[in-house]
Amino acid sequence: MLVAALASLSLALGAAGSAQARVGLPPVVNRVPTQEKVVFITIDDGWNHDPEAARILLEKRVPVSLFLLPGAASYDTEYFTRLIGEGRASVENHTVNHPDLTTLDAAGKDAEVCGAGEQLQAAFGRTPKLLRPPYGAVNDEVRLAAKACGVKALVTWTYDFTTWGETPPTPRLRSGDIVLLHFTPTLAADLQRALDAAKAAGLKPAALMPHLKTAGLV
């Protein structure tokens, strides 16, 4: 696929030195600089297709970025196409198999990032431009691979609202925060808690990509 391109880019960056290696690579974003009273809701993976969470997203018209694994989306694509078509959802890249990308060679990174992009494009008719690296694991080699696959920004998160065992403490959200959720059995409750936290802070959910553009990050 793009292994040769990755190798050429890697050699060029190495010759330019470590400082130059960061020039032109997609940014890693865990919070969006903005003066607007907004937060960004993101949901990962896609294994649990919760109808109650879908109802909340659709009824409240919540802008949301879905960082999907192609396999998780493939057995019920209609669940996600409804969120896109009737709601305010966009589908983004979360790799094929959810590996720690920093542990893979160039070919492995290419297969995971480009491969997921191609599969999601085939399923939803749009090539994702944002990547959430699994576990938030990222380095310049991951950014280089992402760039070769057409990724404009790597998006991590400010706060994880997912209930992993016990309900986590609810932080006070600030403008530009990125909220992480997962398609788990607790998604509906986690989503409502995040929306309540945003409302308590005087913030509204907003679409991520337009604000990344406004901030000059993509």
Predicted regions and their residues:
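Acidic-and-aromatic substrate-binding clefts and catalytic sites of carbohydrate-active enzymes
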Residues: G46-H49, L68-T77, D100-A106, R132-V138, ...
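Extracytoplasmic/secreted proteins, especially bacterial periplasmic and envelope-associated proteins
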Residues: V38, E52, E78, G108-A111, ...
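CE4/NodB-like, metal-dependent polysaccharide N-deacetylase domain
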Residues: I56-L58, V62-P63, S90, A106-N139, ...
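His/Asp/Glu-enriched short active-site or ligand-binding loop at hydrolase and phosphoryl-transfer sites
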Residues: T127, A137-S175, L203-T214
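Structural recognition of the beta-strand scaffold that forms the well-ordered cores
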Residues: V39-I43, V64-L68, S90-N93, K129-P133, ...
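Active-site beta->alpha N-cap acidic-glycine motif
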Residues: R22-D100, Q119
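C-terminal domain-boundary segment and adjacent tail
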Residues: R22-Q35, E59-K60, S74, A188-V218
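Secretory targeting and sorting signals
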Residues: M1-A21
